[in-house]
């Protein structure tokens, strides 16, 4: 499309929307661009920053609503940070906000990964910034810890949920899959809480009636058909490289990726390195390293890999393919989340899933701390950051920048 046509379309869109709607969408876009540009450290950091912005600072959502979105997003494949952001975008800006929030969150990470991939192909190595970013890790850990503390106080409001949380967190350390723990935790919650929980129409926000039925959105059936088609195509293509085959691979992975984003590494190793030979072992390790030290979810390593394999077109195709299912799953969840609060048993299930999600986040923090808190300087930075952020509502970006400077001074001297 030519530039003047794009400009005309933009002007027409501005006239079509009222001032308040345009203001909401612009605030949403700015927020998601900021999150996408600064969310270093994984999905939990992005969720912590999102909680600070939309719950504590802007008060767009209550803590309970935010927890419901996190809990539901953990039940479907894909990066929770992207799906939660998209869902929040819909609640604040409608379907246009749904699209804008997702694009603005993903675009900065994809752009940064593409720049790193270009440098990698030009110089054959990673830029030397990993050592600097190591100093930010205690700050990131403190931000994550504060978010889990705040959300946990809302989610775990009785002894039954506390038992479920302890069970899920403990089981995760013994290697039980995240999705299994979420489903088991939800089922236990239905049994322990469903008998004791009464739901009024005011609490559910939905008028109750005897003939109310739980509706399964059409998007769910569309997703199942799409996944079946992908499996059929996947079983019948050769390992020769093309944009179409690259797209099929990442669509398939994104439709099946439950739990930690690190499961992605197993898919990449098994098919791109071992089966197809599209990547070398070193290229895969470098792609994962880049994803860890730059903003965005681990799945955004697909952008880096796409560029290595097929240049700019490969980066675009890989990025769209790895994140497209998240938009579809989020669209399916939008109608489901509100319905879950409309019934006693499903509300109990969601409460338990929320608690299980918080427990899994706590387990992630403990696991990360084992590799981050190995020096006394790291402990000092963690404690200072946590106390400051707990006492005052300091923007996460300032905490990260300040922590990086303090870390540089402490580790230098």
Annotate each predicted stretch with a short phrase:
Residues 80-83:
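Conserved beta-loop-alpha segment that forms the PLP phosphate-binding cup at the N-terminus of a helix
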Residues 3-76, 87-294, 298-413:
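Multi-pass membrane proteins that catalyze or facilitate reactions on polyprenyl-/lipid-phosphate substrates
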């Amino acid at each position: 499309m030519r530039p003047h046509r794009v400009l005309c379309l933009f002007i027409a869109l501005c006239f079509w929307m009222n001032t308040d709607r345009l203001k909401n969408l612009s605030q949403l876009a700015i927020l998601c661009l900021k999150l996408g540009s600064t969310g270093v450290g994984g999905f939990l950091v992005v969720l912590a920053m999102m909680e600070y912005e939309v719950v504590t600072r802007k008060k767009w959502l209550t803590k309970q609503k935010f927890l419901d979105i996190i809990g539901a997003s953990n039940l479907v494949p894909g990066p929770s940070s992207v799906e939660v952001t998209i869902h929040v975008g819909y609640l604040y800006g409608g379907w246009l906000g749904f699209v804008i929030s997702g694009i603005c969150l993903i675009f900065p990470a994809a752009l940064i990964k593409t720049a790193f991939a270009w440098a990698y192909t030009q110089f054959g190595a990673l830029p030397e910034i990993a050592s600097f970013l190591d100093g930010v890790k205690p700050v990131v850990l403190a931000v994550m810890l504060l978010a889990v503390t705040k959300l946990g106080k809302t989610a775990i409001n009785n002894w039954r949920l506390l038992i479920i949380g302890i069970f899920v967190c403990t089981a995760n350390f013994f290697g039980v899959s995240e999705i299994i723990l979420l489903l088991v935790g939800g089922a236990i919650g239905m049994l322990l809480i469903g008998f004791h929980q009464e739901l009024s129409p005011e609490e559910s926000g939905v008028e109750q009636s005897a003939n109310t039925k739980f509706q399964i959105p059409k998007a769910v059936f569309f997703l199942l058909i799409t996944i079946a088609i992908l499996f059929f195509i996947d079983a019948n293509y050769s390992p020769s490289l093309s944009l179409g085959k690259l797209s099929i691979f990442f669509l398939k992975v994104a439709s099946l990726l439950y739990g930690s984003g690190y499961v992605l590494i197993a898919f990449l190793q098994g098919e791109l390195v071992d089966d197809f030979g599209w990547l070398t072992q070193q290229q895969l390790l470098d792609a994962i390293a880049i994803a860890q030290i730059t903003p965005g979810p681990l799945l955004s390593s697909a952008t880096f890999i796409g560029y290595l394999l097929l240049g700019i077109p490969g980066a675009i195709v890989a990025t769209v393919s790895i994140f497209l299912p998240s938009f579809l799953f989020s669209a399916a969840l939008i109608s489901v989340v509100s319905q879950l609060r409309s019934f006693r048993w499903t509300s109990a299930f969601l409460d338990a899933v929320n608690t299980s999600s918080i427990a899994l986040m706590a387990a992630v923090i403990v696991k990360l701390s084992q590799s981050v808190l190995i020096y006394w300087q790291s402990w000092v930075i963690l404690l200072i950051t946590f106390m400051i952020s707990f006492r005052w509502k300091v923007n996460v970006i300032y905490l990260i920048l300040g922590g990086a400077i303090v870390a540089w001074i402490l580790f230098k001297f």
